[in-house]
Amino acid sequence: MKRIAIVGAGMAGLSALSALTKQGHVVTLFDKSRGSGGRMASKKVGDASWDMGAQFIRAHDASFMKTLHEWQHQGWVSEWAVTPHVIDAEGIRLSDDETTRYVGVSRMTALSRQLLAPATEFIPNTRIVSCQRTDSEWLLTDENDQHHGPFDSLIINTPPQQALPLLENSHLAAAINDVEMLPCWTLLLAFPERIDTPVDAAFVHDSAIAWLARNNSKPLRDSGETWVIQASHAWSQEQVDAPREEVLHALEQAFFTALGVQGYAVSEHWLHRWLYAVPAKPLDAGALFDADRAVAVCGDWCQRGTLEGAWLSGQQAASYF
């Protein structure tokens, strides 16, 4: 039995937690946010709520499909029976997409809370800023100069830019130094009435927007009319430091234009910038491991830029211990 620290409670970190606790290890998770889930984030403003990060889960890998079905049996996820539209210069039409999509119920963060349960300890609101390896143990220090540990092994589940300062004396730093992460501006809108459109989700082209979805079309969501609008990564990169009001206005207008509707009053809104949303080019390495220092690094950017990729990456990271 080992004492293992995981920095970052996103999907890959939760995946590693699942595997490690099944092996009997004692696992402590740290996260800079107040909760778990990373990009499985949800947001509530007034009476409105949204999944503001990852919109759904899908599976290509047989082992992950088995895991998804187990979660479904436990009531942690449910199928989102949606066929996305395509919106482009030719108009609005149904896509030929037949992918089965799943969502956490009653929000994406509900799944992360279930996956967090096996942790020996979860320490939120704690940003780890340095990790020191002695002869056989890890000691972690947070931004308030509080020390944590000792631990036998360490798993880092953060974007590569945030992992680098924690890997100063590991050869893994060179392996991830050039990994590029792309941003994504996300606008959340709520309306006092239902928008008259057959679209519940759509891939959008020729626009600042790449994806939009009627959040309340997902199973077991609040009934109020809520929409998630995700900008394209290229547009987000161009506008990465633009004033928030300008970004909000541009995405709101692009939303109405894409759906071909006007005259709907917005009752609530929220704008969020995901600075490290997805990898431009995943490493396709599964996870990275420094055996000499007993540290592994995982995340969707190590495998594939999806929740499935993050889960598989976490499983591989855990296998090293």
Tell me what each language-model feature is.
Residues K2-F30, A318-F321:
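N-terminal Rossmann-like FAD-binding beta1-loop-alpha1 element of flavoenzymes
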Residues T21-V45:
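Glycine-rich FAD pyrophosphate-binding loop
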Residues G37, G46, H147-D200, V261-Y264:
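Central helical "cap/lid" subdomain
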Residues S42-H85:
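N-terminal FAD cofactor-binding segment of flavoenzymes
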Residues F56-H60, I92-Q114, D241-V247:
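Short beta-strand to alpha-helix junction loop
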Residues P124-W138:
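A conserved short coil-to-beta-strand element within the FAD-binding core of flavoproteins
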Residues L188-Q239, E246, A250-L259:
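Active-site substrate-recognition segment that forms the wall
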Residues H249, F256-R293:
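Flavin (FAD/FMN) cofactor-binding core of flavoprotein oxidoreductases
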